[in-house]
């Protein structure tokens, strides 16, 4: 049976995985997802940040059980399809769906007029079945991409990781920074990020830095380096613990966040900063070796 699972699926979190699992019980799963995020078209001022790139979303959806992933370009024309046009042109015309699986918060069609209830009522008339998956909860709150973004932005990385069922990560090229870390014996990989990236709260984290086939335990710093003079934007940088002589510039890097260690602090000079950095690295080394 041709089963179609619909959603944005940013992050491919525990709730999304349940939708794919439900669909997989019914037949071969095609996931239909959207890019750019529909909100960026219908209400650009409310565009959310991204938990993962579209490329990684496709990869994670396949890991979750999808056989095919179709990324639909969500543009102005698409946003103006009525709910019935969406059913006729997209679900049936383009995808030949025999069964559709959605989360209970999935709305569709112009101004999101098509509800899950409406789809389950008209589906049989069009000749396809409909399954509506209840939203998953954790500690009494719904698991959603919005909630996970908030947790990450607040620095609650362990909680976010639980809901994602994996470690949150950022990817980007290693760019040239101020070389400050190199000068003080802690050379860091400075990540170039997409403007859509969801960046954790300023502070120091323990995690992992990967480039190519290599992966190292890392102490990760996010912030503006307030100990040093000058005005700079927020930076995400990772120090590969116990590694010497790495040259990572211009290579694609991945920084995985495992644990939050502390807030960003402003130190009175270099000595107390170096003392704290040694403690951070010791703690990160221990946490990442478990």
Model-identified regions with their sequence ranges:
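N-terminal catalytic cores of NTP/NDP-binding nucleotidyl/phosphoryl-transfer enzymes
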Residues: 1-59
């Amino acid at each position: 049976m041709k089963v179609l699972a619909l959603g944005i699926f940013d992050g491919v979190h525990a709730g999304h995985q349940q939708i794919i699992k439900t669909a997989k019980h019914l037949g071969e799963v095609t996931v239909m997802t959207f890019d750019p995020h529909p909100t960026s078209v219908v209400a650009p001022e409310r565009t959310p940040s991204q938990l993962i790139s579209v490329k990684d979303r496709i990869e994670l959806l396949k890991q979750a059980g999808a056989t095919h992933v179709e990324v639909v370009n969500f543009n102005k024309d698409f946003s103006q399809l009525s709910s019935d046009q969406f059913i006729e042109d997209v679900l049936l015309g383009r995808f030949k769906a025999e069964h559709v699986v959605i989360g209970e918060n999935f709305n569709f069609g112009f101004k999101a007029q098509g509800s899950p209830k409406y789809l389950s009522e008209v589906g049989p008339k069009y000749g396809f079945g409909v399954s509506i998956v209840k939203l998953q909860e954790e500690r009494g709150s719904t698991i959603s991409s919005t909630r996970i973004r908030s947790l990450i932005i607040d620095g609650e990385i362990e909680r976010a990781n639980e809901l994602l069922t994996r470690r949150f990560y950022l990817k980007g090229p290693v760019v040239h920074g101020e070389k400050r870390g190199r000068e003080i014996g802690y050379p860091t990989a400075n990540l170039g990020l997409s403007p859509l990236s969801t960046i954790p709260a300023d502070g120091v984290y323990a995690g992992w830095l990967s480039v190519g086939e290599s992966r190292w335990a890392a102490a990760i710093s996010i912030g503006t380096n307030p100990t040093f003079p000058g005005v700079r934007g927020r930076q995400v940088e990772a120090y590969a613990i116990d590694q010497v002589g790495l040259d990572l510039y211009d290579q694609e890097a991945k920084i995985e966040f495992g644990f939050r260690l502390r807030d960003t602090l402003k130190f009175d000079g270099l000595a107390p900063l170096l003392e704290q950095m040694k403690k951070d690295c010791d703690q990160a080394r221990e946490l990442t070796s478990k």
